[in-house]
């Protein structure tokens, strides 16, 4: 498993709602004060879009992916909180429920958060970009898509 982000050119993109500023493989979330990897784990930024095969991981494997991202990209990458991931949902967008100009080629599927469901501690919260809704029903051994985030 490898996480690769290629930076070919410096480009800036601004979302219509001015919540996000995208620069190469990083997206700055002005509302949450965090930086997102523009691509899902398994994909890489080619200067114009996210390319490659998305890798679905369970919670244990996501720890290894985070270590690898920190080695390759530097910084303190992590799984997002439920609230952070909910903040990038675009309810006005068609499926996937995310701004594709900022987060291209995002699958319309559930994404892991790093947050345990306090009402059902065996489950982890996820945000589904097919529906735009949050669910606290996935078990840690299930494989879901992940997008990494770090504090600014």
What spans do the regions from the language model cover?
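Glycine-aromatic-enriched surface loops/turns that form tight recognition elements
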Residues: 2-78, 82-152
